[in-house]
Amino acid sequence: GGNTECFWKYCV
């Protein structure tokens, strides 16, 4: 937890 940008199932 603590991601800022998520695309589909990939979070960075």
From Swiss-Prot:
Keyword tags: Disulfide bond, Hormone, Secreted
Location (main, coarse): secreted
Disulfide links within the chain: 6-11
Cellular compartment(s): Secreted
Cellular-component GO terms for this entry: extracellular region
Organism this protein belongs to: Cyprinus carpio (Common carp)
One GO term of the biological process aspect: regulation of blood pressure
Protein function: Urotensin is found in the teleost caudal neurosecretory system. It has a suggested role in osmoregulation and as a corticotropin-releasing factor.
MF (Gene Ontology): hormone activity
Lineage, uppermost ranks: Eukaryota, Metazoa, Chordata, Craniata, Vertebrata
Transmembrane annotation, as ranges: none
Nucleotide-binding in keyword set: no
InterPro entries associated with the record: Urotensin_II
Protein name: Urotensin II-beta
Similarity-based family: Belongs to the urotensin-2 family.
